[in-house]
């Protein structure tokens, strides 16, 4: 077969914006016209002569944008800003670019709506760089960081693939993205905090090359799979934690829809606000858990029954705020030490109605405790 040879008017250009290893390279070519077909020849020249490789035909589309310089996204898109529902981006992006991207997703700088309906974003080859204006109220871009509120309140967003060199995902970077179903975490991420209000989120995937995090059935864990860090709100029903889990991170199950949790007895640590505002109805805490931290079940408006293990020694402030508790089962023979607001609630007080079940013969200890004695119904009860 005859090889196609570039014509006299073909442009010869040395391109160096490439990445990759031995055997495969990725070349980024900018300033191409949208919806245009290009013919590209690899060309090399040395003292021994020159060579031209086989022609590659490539047609640009209107859903892929390559930035040569940070801050130029708005000018590249011009009047087509709100025409995109899916988009692949590459190149450097600063605060101006990310503010423009938020407009495409339906949000102005002042959080008012725009006509934008961008739903699917591939940012694999994007480099987030400091500079430019804010992307939100007093929020400025840092190098390699998905900042707090970057995707906040973007109702149309369903899927996002993050840049491969991102190192940090701040708390609530995706807050209130109510259509977001899937997030892909790249290998480079070493610091990550969850986002609240992602009611449709069912799947958090992590690159197998990431040495800090992992994912099992769409749930974000640490690399050793001993700590749950982020449980997707969109998962429903019953959830049994893997037997390898020994701890739950701060706010890991916040606002989740699971009603029944089965926690392994070898778990020894639960983070602050771990189940805050979730739909849990009944929970049996692990036998080895020593402390129930601040706001563990705060805002769990369906939680009625809590079972506390024999090794629990302390309960922190507002652990059960706004919970309509009817029964607390405590296996500890001595009353766990409680902070002064351990059972304080902004809702209807449960101190007069909730029954505290304690080990046989131990009711007197609880009735004599400065905090536990606030409950009007404490009884020795061997039932579990």
List the predicted regions and their residue ranges.
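Consensus positions within tandem repeat domains that build extended binding/scaffold surfaces
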Residues: 147-150, 170-173, 249-252, 271-274, ...
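Boundary/junction segments of secreted and surface-exposed precursor proteins
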Residues: 62-78
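Short, surface-exposed linear motifs at loops/turns and structural transition points
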Residues: 1-62
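Short, aromatic/basic amphipathic alpha-helical patches
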Residues: 100-106, 138, 340-347, 364-375
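Leucine-rich repeat
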Residues: 75-80, 103-113, 150-151, 346-348
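Well-ordered, non-membrane alpha-helical segments in soluble/globular domains
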Residues: 96-109, 142-147
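Extracellular/surface recognition and adhesion modules
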Residues: 1, 42, 58, 87, ...
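Structural signature of tandem-repeat unit edges
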Residues: 64-68, 85-93, 111-144, 154-168, ...
